[in-house]
């Protein structure tokens, strides 16, 4: 299975076998991610982090992943301090950064920017999130979390919150379809899963249900994947105010849940998960954030060819 010099742009570029290989690699590297073992797999390698959108977990976990493997991370810093503010286009930026680093991690607000960057890069490009469409490394870590805390095959999962603009759930739908998941989409009518995604899933014979009620489905699912309503994706602030607090996971709601239910969230959260949930055995979102480190370690090591 060849991963060396491969770009990581969309989950649709990966087969189930390839996804499983990434997850297996992450599991082998997890002791290094936890600081229990040391590794020099990326000794002498430089990873450039080009983030044109705010990020905490994705950026820091890529930095941690690079350093845990003995590599060095070059951080662009603020966009305001870069040549982009002088009018340099993304293609030229990518061409130049390719000369400085062995791999580029890109986060950008425009749909398709990572795919375009890969065309101009002379080193592997990993998509750290572009526009509202793709966020493959988040999906890999979501799959890894589900595999570690529950199971992937024939999973019963509900995705709730902002399903219209949420790139994490869009990527996750495709990936879980490879494992025969049964999916329930919970959202206000204004934030439903895009109809083309629902159609694609149904064509693959995936069972799909849509509702606006968490209470209706909480006892029937094994994983609940919550998302925040993203203020920055709303052109109209009034529309955001109408929907921001419609769905919330509380201790009372979880009384009706399966005892083995796991609650995931890509973070940051706002009001959609009450703090009281944090202390329950259902809460997996902080461990989920940690799992981003071994997953990104695996993707870095595979793309740079230091592990097979």
Swiss-Prot record:
Database matches in Gene3D superfamilies: Aspartate/ornithine carbamoyltransferase (3.40.50.1370)
PROSITE patterns according to UniProt: CARBAMOYLTRANSFERASE
Pathways involved: Pyrimidine metabolism; UMP biosynthesis via de novo pathway; (S)-dihydroorotate from bicarbonate: step 2/3
Binding-site list for L-aspartate: 86, 167, 228
Stated role: Catalyzes the condensation of carbamoyl phosphate and aspartate to form carbamoyl aspartate and inorganic phosphate, the committed step in the de novo pyrimidine nucleotide biosynthesis pathway.
Family from the record: Belongs to the aspartate/ornithine carbamoyltransferase superfamily. ATCase family.
Protein name in the entry: Aspartate carbamoyltransferase catalytic subunit
Organism name: Methanosarcina acetivorans (strain ATCC 35395 / DSM 2834 / JCM 12185 / C2A)
